[in-house]
């Protein structure tokens, strides 16, 4: 498990903000944690052909979007051509966080043939990223993501970019992450410290694996070292040992 510690997302009602690695005053350890995550993924890419990733979690508010954006930025810093895709078609937020404008075309518009992929892509020059918003919320997101057009779009993105990161809804809420996970090379599972019960996390990981998704590993967010030493009945007090798909892609959760 990769640990992103001692940094909590600021909230203002429903208007959450991202904690970017480029923000002024960002702790050194926070930035280095993403570099460590990048190093591990680079190692996997060399032996497992990992270039497309879906980022998900058990429940909302586990900082998965924060992880998706910062991982994309960290990958781009190393000279890679990176695309960040907002696949939360129900409640898209990345376009607001990344200031890509309102009512922008995106995934849903591409899949419904309202525009081409190139027309929907946004260049974020300050972040050295290419961003694909979620687009207009459709009435049937899961069905739309299950269409052959989605697989075709993923394949096109894979050809255009070195790394493609998909930010997907939580596993316990909808099936979208599992659907997307079948199209990509692997999934990164985000676990917020002292938040989702361990049984729920186990169940979410198992659901992904049962659906044929290769879970590469997990990222622990909002970790409090002092609190962890006192013990907890929640997920962060467990050690998640993923075999990086070298064995049978099983997640061993041990106390």
Predicted segments — roles?
Residues 1-255:
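P-loop NTP-binding module
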């Amino acid at each position: 498990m990769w640990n992103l510690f001692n940094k909590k997302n600021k909230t203002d009602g429903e208007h959450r903000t991202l904690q970017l690695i480029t923000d002024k005053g960002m702790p050194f350890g926070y930035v280095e944690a993403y570099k460590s995550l990048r190093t591990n993924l680079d190692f996997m890419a060399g032996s497992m052909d990992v270039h497309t990733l879906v980022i998900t979690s058990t429940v909302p508010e586990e900082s998965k979007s924060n992880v998706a954006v910062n991982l994309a930025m960290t990958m781009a810093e190393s000279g890679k051509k990176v695309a960040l895709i907002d696949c939360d078609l129900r409640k898209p937020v990345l376009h607001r966080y990344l200031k890509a404008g309102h009512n922008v075309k995106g995934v849903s518009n591409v899949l419904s043939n309202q525009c081409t992929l190139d027309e929907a892509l946004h260049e974020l020059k300050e972040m050295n990223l290419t961003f694909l918003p979620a687009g207009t919320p459709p009435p049937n997101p899961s069905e739309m993501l299950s269409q052959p057009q989605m697989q075709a779009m993923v394949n096109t993105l894979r050809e255009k970019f070195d790394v493609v990161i998909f930010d997907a809804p939580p596993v316990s809420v909808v099936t979208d992450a599992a659907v997307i996970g079948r199209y990509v090379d692997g999934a990164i599972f985000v676990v917020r410290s002292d938040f989702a019960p361990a049984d729920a996390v186990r169940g979410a990981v198992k659901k992904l694996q049962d659906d044929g998704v290769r879970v590469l590993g997990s990222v622990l967010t909002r970790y409090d070292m002092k609190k962890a030493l006192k013990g907890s009945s929640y997920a962060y007090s467990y050690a998640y040992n993923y075999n990086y798909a070298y064995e049978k892609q099983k997640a061993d959760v041990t106390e």
